[in-house]
């Protein structure tokens, strides 16, 4: 059942008034594939626009906080924690992991996915002048805890 549709099939924001407040957490990932020279430039701190990982991390955190402004039926949430980690993976990939937490009545999957996505988009934006062929890939939810639907973890 699609919870964002009413009995006439119209979109609406789900009423969570009666849902219990529980601890909730979601972890999402994304990858940005690029030329080895581009990744080397980032890791060596030689990018002309500055510290790509630092800027992308802040963008991801800000995006998590702004998710309800971007996704129409998402509830505005009072996140209690957002963490974005970036790491070079091999010679041509940046791996992004975004983690969002709160004690609330609805999950934080969309916030974690938005954080990972905007982090990847920021890397693309900062590096497109030197590498137009970058690919953002594998944006997905890795794990979520809390709430009525319980625990979910992607299978390896």
Swiss-Prot record:
- Tell me the InterPro entries matching this sequence: MoaC (IPR023045), MoaC_bact/euk (IPR047594), MoaC_sf (IPR036522), MoCo_biosynth_MoaA/MoaC (IPR050105), Mopterin_CF_biosynth-C_dom (IPR002820)
Check the record and name the Pfam families matching this protein. Answer: MoaC (PF01967)
Q: Which reaction does it catalyse?
A: (8S)-3',8-cyclo-7,8-dihydroguanosine 5'-triphosphate = cyclic pyranopterin phosphate + diphosphate
GO biological-process terms attached to the record: Mo-molybdopterin cofactor biosynthetic process
Q: Superkingdom of the source?
A: Bacteria
The enzyme's main class, written as a single word, is lyase
Q: Could you tell me the EC number(s) of this protein? A: 4.6.1.17
Q: Entry's SUPFAM superfamilies?
A: Molybdenum cofactor biosynthesis protein C, MoaC
- Active site residues of this protein: 125
Q: Which Gene3D superfamilies match?
A: Molybdopterin cofactor biosynthesis C (MoaC) domain (3.30.70.640)
Q: Where does substrate bind?
A: 73-75, 110-111
Q: In which pathway does it act?
A: Cofactor biosynthesis; molybdopterin biosynthesis
Q: What positions belong to coiled-coil segments? A: none
Say if the entry is tagged with keyword Glycosyltransferase: no
List the Gene Ontology MF annotations in alphabetical order.
cyclic pyranopterin monophosphate synthase activity
Provide this UniProt record's keywords sorted from A to Z.
Lyase, Molybdenum cofactor biosynthesis
Question: What is the stated purpose of this protein?
Answer: Catalyzes the conversion of (8S)-3',8-cyclo-7,8-dihydroguanosine 5'-triphosphate to cyclic pyranopterin monophosphate (cPMP).
Query: PANTHER family, alphabetically?
Result: CYCLIC PYRANOPTERIN MONOPHOSPHATE SYNTHASE (PTHR22960:SF29), MOLYBDOPTERIN COFACTOR SYNTHESIS PROTEIN A (PTHR22960)
Q: How does it assemble?
A: Homohexamer; trimer of dimers.
Q: What is this protein called?
A: Cyclic pyranopterin monophosphate synthase
